Structures are given as C-alpha cells and as structure tokens.
Amino acid sequence: MSAVVLGIDLGTSAVKVSAIDKQGNVVAQASAKYALQQPHPGYSEQDPEDWVTQTTQAIRELLQQSEVTADQIEGLSYSGQMHGLVLLDESATVLRPAILWNDTRTTSQCRELESQFGDDFIKITGNRPLEGFTLPKLLWVKENEPNIWKRARTFLLPKDYLRYRMTGKLAMDKSDATGTVLLDITTSQWSETLCNQLDIPLTLCPPLIESTAYVGHINQTYAQLSGLSVNTKVFGGAADNAAGAVGAGILSSDKALVSIGTSGVVLKYEDNAQTDYRGVLQYERHAFPGKYYSMGVTLAAGYSLNWFKQTFAPDEDFGTVVASAEQSTIGANGLLFAPYIVGERAPYADATIRGSFIGVDGSHQRADFVRAVLEGIIFSFEDLIKLYQHNGAEFKTIVSIGGGAKSALWLQIQADIFNCKVVSLKNEQGPGMGAAMIAATGLGWFKTLADCAQTFVHYGKAYYPVTAHVAQYQEMYRLYQQIYVQTQPITAGLLEQRKQH
C-alpha cells in the first residue's frame, strides 16, 4: 500500500480517524465515543483526557484492523469541535473540565460584552458575543472560579489540546481562533484591545498558526501509546466548519455549503472580511491562508425533523418518514412549518421564538406535515441565502451535505426553493476529509488546497430547479416570511406561560 494521511475529526460525541491515500480514497477508518457531562442545567463539559485516550484507541484500532502501517502514514491533521475552553497551568496540566460550544452558562458575560463594546465588538471580531464562543467562557471562569483563573497560563481549543499531547507543541490555528471571538478579524492576531480592556493577559493566548502549517512530528511518548511513527508529520488543522468546507470543495465565492445536521449551516467562502453582515452571520478565518468564510446557523434543522419523527412516527425509520412526503404536493397542500422549535440564531437571534404549523386543514394528512417540515427547514435556509444575495453573492452551485443530501426528494426541494443547482458529495466524509486534505497539502502532495480538491472532492448527481416548482415555492416563501413577525409575540407569551406553570 502507498502513502496515506490521517484526518482526525474530533467531534462532540466521538472521534473519527480516516486514512486517505493520494487519490483521495478512504482506505481505513475507526472511531471511538466519549462522554458528555452536564452537571447543571445549561452546562456542557468534557474531560480533555477522554479526547486523548479515545483518539489513541481509534488510531490503534485502525492500525490493527487494516493493512495501513505506521510507516505509511506520512502526515496527519485535525478537524475539531469549535469554541470549547481548555485551560492549562504552567506545566500544561488541565485545570478543569473543558467548557463546550453548546454550554449556555455565559449569558451574563455576553450581555456585559455587548454593553462594554457595542458594535465595536463586531468590528473587531466579525461576530456578536454569543454563549457558544470561547471569550465569554474565559470571563465566566475569571468571575466564578478565581483560584483556577490565577493558575491559568494558556488556553486551547479541543483539537489544539489533542495536537499538543501528540507533539508537545502549543498552538492554535487561525480558523479555530476566530471562533474564540478574541481574535482581531482584520489583522488575524489576538486583539490587544479586548485583552487589555477585559484584563486578560495576552500571554494566555497561544501562538497562532495557519491550518496547513507544519507543527512538528509525533513525539516519542505518543508514538509508544498509539503505535504511530515518530516520523509522521503533524499539521495545524482547522475548525470543523472550515474543515467541512474544505472537504466539500467550498473554495470559491460562487459555491455555498448547506449542511443539515442537528442545526443547519449555510456557509460561503470569502476573499476578505469586508462585507458588513452586521453580526447576523458569523465571520471566521478559512483553512486557506489569508482567506475567510462566513456562515449563518439555524438552530433546529435536522432537529426539527427528528422531533417530528420521534413524536409522530417513533416506530418508523427516517427514510420511510421522509419518503412519505412524496405523497404530498409542492407547498404541502397549503401547509407551512416554521422550524423555530428551540429558538433561532440567524437571521433573527431570538431565544423566545418557537415553531408553528400554519394553515392546518381538516383534509391534511401526515404526509403533508412531513413535507411541510422538509420545506420549512429549507425556507429557513433560504432566509440566509437571500441575505447573502442582498449583499451581492451570486451562487452557481450549492453543495448539500448531512441529512438533506440523503434524499433525492429533499435535494430537489432544495434546488427548487434556492432556484439553484444543488449537488451532493459522492463519498461524504465530513470534516475528516478536510483534515486529511490539510495534511496532504501540508506535506506537499498538492501545491494548494484547491489543487487537492481537484483530486479528493467528487460530486454526485446534480439537481436543477424546475421552473414551475420555483414559481410555486416563491409564493409559499413570501407567506413563510410573515410567520416570524406574526407569531413572535404569541410564542414568546406562550413560552412565558410555560415558565410560570
């Protein structure tokens, strides 16, 4: 067997390790799960040691159960869950459990940042201060755990801690660093303004590197633990969204990525950070040196479908439930669904809005409700596509990944609502493929990530908008756009009633 690279995808619930050859083929894979701790409502934590032990287990399993040998692994890189805070002391020992991206304890710190900096915060970081980001977590520890704060000497993000344990080198790549909202989006350096005004030592911030930068080799200690070779080179890696964009070939501004996971993401490549989205969309550094991406997040994309399935069709599999939508019509026989069942982030940033079915009629069947859910999720994405188009974007292709790419019907619905060609990936591997591409480019197998994509990224069938369908969906979308404004005060009042009773 020829040379391979490893793409290590450190997710929220599991790590997946993929061995990829020079033709972009997945030749071996292994994964391992780890636990999530929720000691209090709104808290979400993990033990960083679990990331190390489970990654090691996955690597050992890959080597033992495949024909890949340690000497064939020329390099590796990472994709990582974003925003999680890992605090280290002067000996680089972890001080407390990592506070994860989905931890919501930091609302008061976010409000303080808004009050102190106003719109300047968006100008500096490209983002609003949201609970998921790392800076509010730092401020929470500073305010609530002063003894730990006094001992802290540096902070890392999840994949950066894993990289440190494998190489002994402390660093953070810039694509992940933007998600801390402590990075100056214009200079791509740590913001001295924020650090000084918030009394955060600049020395707490780790050295910054590019995603494809060479960091070091696997150290002797980790080589003995994992079975890897000390000759294997290690490269920076990227935040999961950046790595996912690389793995999907989102390398130019005429393509958008639509991802339907638990939440939903619409992501666009950006040459610079100059477009003013007024904080509605997040700005992040891309895995490409000097490039960026922006993205809008909807909170309950796949979650809405999962909720519907578990509530109304618990004994059926997802494929059967989704396929039943074919029994309905475009526009679900005049039924609309707003997928705000856990609130919304973009474009509304509203924690109190809730979902609704609009237009329920005695003639509606379950298939109509399924179709309305599928269409409503895509209408929520169309809100973000329209925001991009309002700011001058012209998309020729939309790449669909995740749950929305597993159904031909849903792919056609996307093409018709977006009025754009939609493609899926032939062999969807998620951010792990992007991590492998970063390693392959870092090694010099390819001159650039774009060159690597020519070999590694392949698209499946293209779905084109049907003119008659587009016209019908545009009428439905105009009605859909009224739902938020009309239902917001009602659902906020209902939420308050639930809290009181």
Curated annotation (Swiss-Prot):
GO terms for MF: ATP binding; D-xylulokinase activity
User: Entry's SUPFAM superfamilies?
Assistant: Actin-like ATPase domain
Could you name the domain of life of the organism this protein comes from? Bacteria
Residues recorded as binding substrate, renumbered to this chain, are: 82-83
Q: What is its EC number?
A: 2.7.1.17
Q: Which CDD domains match?
A: ASKHA_NBD_FGGY_EcXK-like
Q: Which UniProt keywords apply?
A: ATP-binding, Carbohydrate metabolism, Kinase, Nucleotide-binding, Transferase, Xylose metabolism
Which top EC class is named for this enzyme in its record? Answer: transferase
Q: Which Gene3D superfamilies match?
A: 3.30.420.40
Keyword Nucleotide-binding (UniProt): yes
**Catalysed reaction equations from the record:** D-xylulose + ATP = D-xylulose 5-phosphate + ADP + H(+)
Residues at the site labelled Important for activity? 9
| GO biological process assignments | D-xylose metabolic process; xylulose catabolic process
Give the annotated active site: 240
Q: Which residues form the signal peptide?
A: none
UniProt similarity note: Belongs to the FGGY kinase family.
Query: What function does this protein fulfil?
Result: Catalyzes the phosphorylation of D-xylulose to D-xylulose 5-phosphate.
Q: Output this protein's name.
A: Xylulose kinase
